[in-house]
C-alpha cells in the first residue's frame, strides 16, 4: 500500500530498529519489532527476544503506559494467528481493542501468511499492509529468503589487502584487517547461525570461529561452526573441534576415512556426509535451513568461496579491506571462475564505511539462480 503519512513511516522505522535488537537471539524466529501509538505518542514498544519468549506484539502490550483501546499498532511482520510455543498475537490485539494495525510485511510462513491479517479484519480491525515495507524487508531478508526458498541467506565474508589478496603467498590470512574490523566481524558472526569454512583455511589459520565482543568476551549465543572437508584432512586437534565454546558440524563425503569420522564423533562433533565425491553445498545449505539457520556466513578460503559463486549460492557479501599490499604472489579472493565482463557476477553495493584503518564494503548479488525447495 502507499504510505499514508510520514508519521506512520516514522513509527514503522522505529519498529524495524526495535526488531534489530533481537537479531542475534530470535532465530529461527524472525526478529520482529512492534510500536503501539495513541494520540501520536508511543505508549508501548517491544521486540522478540528469543525462541519461546513473548513475541514483539506481546512485549509491546506488556509495556503499555495506558489503555490500548483506540491505539494503533505498528509491527514489522504480520502478527501470528496459530498456537506454537506462544499463543496467537492476533487474539491479544483483538482483546485489547486496538483501532488499527499497520504491518510492514506479510509473513511467508504458510501457517501465518494472510491468515493473521484476515483474523484481525474479521474482528473489525482495519489492517494496512506495506507501510515501511522496504525497511522491513531489508531487516528481515534472511528470514524471508529462508521461508520462501528453503535455503539460508548466504553471506560471503572475506578480508583482503588493498590489492585484492586474501592471504600471503604462504596461505596465511590472519590479521589482514584491523582490530576494529575484526570486532565488527564478531557481531556479523553472532548475527549468523552458522559459519562455513574450508579445510585449507582451518589447516593454515587454525581459527576458533567464535563470535566475540570487541573486548574479547564471547557472545552468549555462538554460531554453529561448519567445516567442509571432503577427505578428512583437518587435524583432529584443530580449535574448531574444541566444543567448549560452541558446536561444530563436519561436512564431508564418502571419501573420508571411517576411522577419522568416528574420532570426530567421539569428540562430540556432528558429521554430515554427502554421497557425491564433493560436498554437496546446496544440500548442506538445505540441511542447515532445516536446522533453523536463517543466515550463514561463508568465511572461505578462496576455493570454497569460488565453489559457492560457481553454484550461484551467494546472496550477499562483506569485504574488509586492510591497509596492506601483498603483491601478485598473494592469494586471490576467488579463483578459476573464468569470467569476462559480460559473464561477470553483478552486485549492488549497499554500504561502504571506514572501520578505523580498514574499509568495509557490503554488497548484494543481483543475479541469482532461481531455486525452490525441491531444487
From Swiss-Prot:
<feature type="binding site">
    <location>
        <position position="212"/>
    </location>
    <ligand>
        <name>substrate</name>
    </ligand>
</feature>
<keyword id="KW-0560">Oxidoreductase</keyword>
<keyword id="KW-0378">Hydrolase</keyword>
<keyword id="KW-0686">Riboflavin biosynthesis</keyword>
<comment type="function">
    <text>Converts 2,5-diamino-6-(ribosylamino)-4(3h)-pyrimidinone 5'-phosphate into 5-amino-6-(ribosylamino)-2,4(1h,3h)-pyrimidinedione 5'-phosphate.</text>
</comment>
<comment type="similarity">
    <text>In the C-terminal section; belongs to the HTP reductase family.</text>
</comment>
<feature type="binding site">
    <location>
        <position position="175"/>
    </location>
    <ligand>
        <name>NADP(+)</name>
    </ligand>
</feature>
<protein>
    <recommendedName>
        <fullName>Riboflavin biosynthesis protein RibD</fullName>
        <ecNumber>3.5.4.26</ecNumber>
        <ecNumber>1.1.1.193</ecNumber>
    </recommendedName>
</protein>
<feature type="binding site">
    <location>
        <position position="230"/>
    </location>
    <ligand>
        <name>NADP(+)</name>
    </ligand>
</feature>
<dbReference type="GO" id="GO:0008703">
    <property type="term" value="F:5-amino-6-(5-phosphoribosylamino)uracil reductase activity"/>
</dbReference>
<keyword id="KW-0521">NADP</keyword>
<keyword id="KW-0862">Zinc</keyword>
<feature type="binding site">
    <location>
        <position position="189"/>
    </location>
    <ligand>
        <name>substrate</name>
    </ligand>
</feature>
<feature type="active site" description="Proton donor">
    <location>
        <position position="57"/>
    </location>
</feature>
<dbReference type="InterPro" id="IPR024072">
    <property type="entry name" value="DHFR-like_dom_sf"/>
</dbReference>
<comment type="pathway">
    <text>Cofactor biosynthesis; riboflavin biosynthesis; 5-amino-6-(D-ribitylamino)uracil from GTP: step 3/4.</text>
</comment>
<dbReference type="InterPro" id="IPR016192">
    <property type="entry name" value="APOBEC/CMP_deaminase_Zn-bd"/>
</dbReference>
<dbReference type="Pfam" id="PF01872">
    <property type="entry name" value="RibD_C"/>
</dbReference>
<comment type="similarity">
    <text>In the N-terminal section; belongs to the cytidine and deoxycytidylate deaminase family.</text>
</comment>
<feature type="binding site">
    <location>
        <position position="55"/>
    </location>
    <ligand>
        <name>Zn(2+)</name>
    </ligand>
</feature>
<feature type="binding site">
    <location>
        <position position="201"/>
    </location>
    <ligand>
        <name>NADP(+)</name>
    </ligand>
</feature>
<dbReference type="InterPro" id="IPR004794">
    <property type="entry name" value="Eubact_RibD"/>
</dbReference>
<dbReference type="InterPro" id="IPR002125">
    <property type="entry name" value="CMP_dCMP_dom"/>
</dbReference>
<keyword id="KW-0511">Multifunctional enzyme</keyword>
<dbReference type="InterPro" id="IPR016193">
    <property type="entry name" value="Cytidine_deaminase-like"/>
</dbReference>
<dbReference type="Pfam" id="PF00383">
    <property type="entry name" value="dCMP_cyt_deam_1"/>
</dbReference>
<feature type="binding site">
    <location>
        <position position="159"/>
    </location>
    <ligand>
        <name>NADP(+)</name>
    </ligand>
</feature>
<keyword id="KW-0479">Metal-binding</keyword>
<dbReference type="GO" id="GO:0008835">
    <property type="term" value="F:diaminohydroxyphosphoribosylaminopyrimidine deaminase activity"/>
</dbReference>
<feature type="binding site">
    <location>
        <position position="209"/>
    </location>
    <ligand>
        <name>substrate</name>
    </ligand>
</feature>
<feature type="region of interest" description="Reductase">
    <location>
        <begin position="151"/>
        <end position="375"/>
    </location>
</feature>
<feature type="binding site">
    <location>
        <position position="299"/>
    </location>
    <ligand>
        <name>substrate</name>
    </ligand>
</feature>
<dbReference type="InterPro" id="IPR011549">
    <property type="entry name" value="RibD_C"/>
</dbReference>
<dbReference type="GO" id="GO:0009231">
    <property type="term" value="P:riboflavin biosynthetic process"/>
</dbReference>
<feature type="region of interest" description="Deaminase">
    <location>
        <begin position="1"/>
        <end position="150"/>
    </location>
</feature>
<feature type="binding site">
    <location>
        <position position="173"/>
    </location>
    <ligand>
        <name>substrate</name>
    </ligand>
</feature>
<dbReference type="InterPro" id="IPR002734">
    <property type="entry name" value="RibDG_C"/>
</dbReference>
<feature type="binding site">
    <location>
        <position position="80"/>
    </location>
    <ligand>
        <name>Zn(2+)</name>
    </ligand>
</feature>
<feature type="domain" description="CMP/dCMP-type deaminase">
    <location>
        <begin position="6"/>
        <end position="127"/>
    </location>
</feature>
<dbReference type="InterPro" id="IPR050765">
    <property type="entry name" value="Riboflavin_Biosynth_HTPR"/>
</dbReference>
<feature type="binding site">
    <location>
        <position position="205"/>
    </location>
    <ligand>
        <name>NADP(+)</name>
    </ligand>
</feature>
<comment type="pathway">
    <text>Cofactor biosynthesis; riboflavin biosynthesis; 5-amino-6-(D-ribitylamino)uracil from GTP: step 2/4.</text>
</comment>
Amino acid at each position: 500500500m502507499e504510505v499514508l503519512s510520514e508519521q506512520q513511516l516514522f513509527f514503522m522505522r522505529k519498529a524495524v530498529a526495535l526488531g534489530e535488537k533481537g537479531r542475534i537471539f530470535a532465530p529461527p524466529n524472525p526478529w520482529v519489532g512492534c510500536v503501539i501509538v495513541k494520540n501520536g505518542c508511543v505508549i508501548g514498544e517491544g521486540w522478540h527476544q528469543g525462541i519461546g519468549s513473548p513475541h514483539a506484539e506481546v512485549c509491546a502490550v506488556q509495556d503499555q503506559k495506558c489503555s490500548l483501546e483506540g491505539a494503533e499498532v505498528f509491527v514489522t511482520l504480520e502478527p501470528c494467528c496459530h498456537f506454537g510455543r506462544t499463543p496467537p498475537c492476533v487474539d491479544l490485539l483483538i482483546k485489547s481493542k486496538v483501532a488499527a494495525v499497520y504491518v510492514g510485511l506479510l509473513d511467508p510462513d504458510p501457517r501465518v501468511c494472510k491468515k493473521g491479517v484476515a483474523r484481525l479484519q474479521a474482528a473489525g480491525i482495519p489492517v494496512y499492509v506495506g507501510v515501511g515495507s522496504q525497511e522491513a524487508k531489508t531487516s528481515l531478508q534472511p528470514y524471508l529468503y529462508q521461508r520462501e526458498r528453503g535455503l539460508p541467506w548466504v553471506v560471503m565474508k572475506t578480508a583482503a589487502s588493498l590489492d585484492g589478496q586474501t592471504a600471503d603467498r604462504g596461505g596465511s590470512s590472519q590479521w589482514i584487517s584491523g582490530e576494529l574490523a575484526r570486532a565488527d566481524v564478531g557481531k556479523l558472526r553472532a548475527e549468523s547461525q552458522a559459519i562455513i569454512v574450508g579445510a585449507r583455511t582451518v589447516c593454515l589459520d587454525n581459527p576458533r570461529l567464535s563470535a566475540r565482543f570487541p573486548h574479547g568476551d564471547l557472545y552468549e549465543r555462538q554460531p554453529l561452526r561448519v567445516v567442509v572437508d571432503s577427505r578428512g584432512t583437518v587435524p583432529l586437534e584443530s580449535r574448531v573441534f574444541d566444543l567448549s565454546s560452541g558446536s561444530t558440524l563436519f561436512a564431508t563425503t564418502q571419501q573420508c576415512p571411517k576411522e577419522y569420522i568416528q574420532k570426530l564423533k567421539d569428540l562430540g562433533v556432528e558429521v554430515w556426509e554427502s554421497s557425491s565425491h564433493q560436498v554437496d553445498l546446496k544440500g548442506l545449505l538445505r540441511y542447515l535451513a532445516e536446522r533453523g539457520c536463517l543466515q550463514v556466513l561463508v568465511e572461505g578460503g578462496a576455493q570454497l568461496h569460488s565453489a559457492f559463486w560457481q553454484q550461484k549460492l551467494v546472496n550477499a557479501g562483506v569485504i574488509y579491506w586492510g591497509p596492506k599490499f601483498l603483491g601478485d604472489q598473494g592469494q586471490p579472493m576467488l579463483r578459476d571462475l573464468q569470467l569476462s565482463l559480460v559473464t561477470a557476477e553483478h552486485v549492488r553495493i549497499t554500504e561502504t564505511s571506514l572501520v578505523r584503518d580498514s574499509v568495509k564494503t557490503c554488497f548484494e548479488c543481483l543475479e541469482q539462480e532461481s531455486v525452490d525447495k525441491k531444487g
